[in-house]
């Protein structure tokens, strides 16, 4: 699968950003940028065009839930699918992500197949 969609990967750990970026690239999604927290992500989202956000939940300054809320209340950004990626597998986090408008949720560690499947499913639901 190859597509020209642009991804923003948000995680406070550079190693995790690099892993997600490489997994996306291996899945045919080669256009990606990175941000270290929700504040940096919002700045990039408001100043560049992105098609998909993959974000960690637990980050300093602005966590993934706060970032999701900011994206969903912004008229120019609310259409963006947001995939929450976290080490937390708590039911309340999964429910909060869904209620907040996240397009999906996966738990670390995950495989390339899991990430690719979730991204592809979200894109199909969006008609992309």
Regions inferred by a protein language model and the residue ranges of each:
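Two-component/phosphorelay signaling modules centered on CheY-like receiver
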Residues: 14-33
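Receiver (REC) domain active-site loop signature in two-component systems and cognate sites
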Residues: 59
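Short amphipathic alpha-helix used as the core "switch/output" element in two-component signaling
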Residues: 43, 65-78
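Helix N-cap/capping motif at the beta->alpha junctions
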Residues: 34-43, 64
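Active-site beta3 strand of CheY-like receiver
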Residues: 48-54
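C-terminal output helix
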Residues: 110-120
């Amino acid at each position: 699968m190859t597509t020209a969609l642009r991804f923003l990967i948000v995680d406070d750990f550079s190693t995790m950003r690099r892993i997600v970026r490489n997994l996306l690239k291996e899945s045919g999604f080669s256009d990606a940028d990175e941000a270290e927290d929700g504040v940096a992500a919002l700045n990039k989202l408001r100043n560049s065009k992105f098609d998909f956000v993959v974000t960690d939940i637990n980050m300093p300054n602005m966590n993934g839930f706060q970032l999701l809320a900011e994206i969903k209340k912004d008229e120019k950004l609310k259409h963006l699918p947001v995939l929450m990626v976290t080490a937390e597998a708590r039911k309340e986090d999964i429910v909060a992500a869904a209620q907040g408008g996240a397009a999906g949720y996966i738990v670390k560690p995950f495989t390339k197949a899991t990430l690719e499947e979730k991204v592809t499913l979200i894109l199909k639901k969006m008609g992309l």
